[in-house]
Amino acid sequence: MKYGRTFNFSAGPAMMPEPVLEEIRDEMMNYRGSGMCVMEMSHRSKVFQQIADEAQADLRKLMNIPDNYKVLFIQGGGTLQFAMVAMNLMKNGKACYVETGAWSKKAIAEAKKYGEVQVVASSADKNFSYIPDCSDLDIPEDADYVYICENETINGTTWHKLPNTKGHVLVSDQSSMFLSRPCNVSDSGLIWAGVQKNVGPAGMAVVIIREDLIRDDLDPKTPIYMKYKTHADNDSMYNTPNCWAIYCCGKVFKYLLSIGGLEEMEKRNIAKAQVIYDFLDSSKLFKGAVVPQDRSLMNIPFVTGDKELDAAVVAASKEAGFDNLKGHKSVGGLRASVYNAMPIEGAQALVEFLTKFEAEHK
């Protein structure tokens, strides 16, 4: 690759589009005549305010976000949102969660600190290898919301059809599939995503929340930073935001618009994921970990069935110029994360490597 860069299959932080990195490089020392790097700017300056405004406007255009939704840029990444969602949305103290893998499990554990949590569906019975049927969930009338992790980064499943929430608010963690395909924002009351997988550097989450869900009647002990209203009322600048992440994400939003938006991005993602899945389906050594109908376009876990052989694949992949193919420590095996910025050439090169490895280990 250009600049001696590697095909980085990390689950996050992950690859960013090369044209975006080049533009950031060119603006590093003197952003548009300001005499300083964006990292050095006051978040109260007119120059940075324009950066933040453009980032929000471009994201709204990219996702066709309705006017009655607020876009918030909040520090703390994804894990903070496990708590913020529950603290802000549990008005009746009751919520429903669908358990589909490691990250929805973490969200459930955190939400239990703030109210009653009902797991209305789970795929734990088959090691989270599928998305459960959620067409007729048993949802209590007084449940405040239904929560899903729309793409499980570790387990490699994704929702291709959203659950029937029977009129209840849907909350979706889109972290590892954010901006990878079109979505109807109004299907959810709140969408959030840690940005370090598909759109920027670590340390920030994007929250898209319907205005009627922004409450002022929270528990008085709720930290002011943990209130969505604090961020909504101050246009994400109650305190110094993650200026660098906002700037970098804004660049990615513009890049996605320039290539044809999320429809084009989805086409590219389908094409490169299919390259890998086609190989796995025909391989006698490597096996995918997810049922075909629920496979993620972003995170592809697979195994040989032999831990020592899995480790040998990881070692050989590094020698071949690939990075981060080792599966998550909680599940082992192998995983290729092919986020938006991964070119199809990366998927093709990976399959070529795996094909050679299989031939050498018959």
Give a label for each model feature.
Residues 1, 6, 319, 332-362:
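PLP-dependent enzyme catalytic core of the Aspartate aminotransferase-like
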Residues 5-56:
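A glycine-/small-polar-enriched, mobile loop at the entrance of the PLP active site in fold-type I
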Residues 12, 111, 123-178:
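Active-site phosphate-binding strand-loop segment of PLP-dependent enzymes
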Residues 34-81, 88, 102, 110:
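Conserved N-terminal alpha-helix of the aminotransferase class I/II PLP-enzyme fold
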Residues 79-146:
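PLP-dependent aminotransferase-like
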Residues 171, 185-196, 205:
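Conserved active-site segment immediately N-terminal to the catalytic lysine
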Residues 195-277, 291, 360-362:
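Active-site C-terminal subdomain of aminotransferase-like
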Residues 286-317:
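Conserved PLP-binding catalytic core of the aspartate aminotransferase-like
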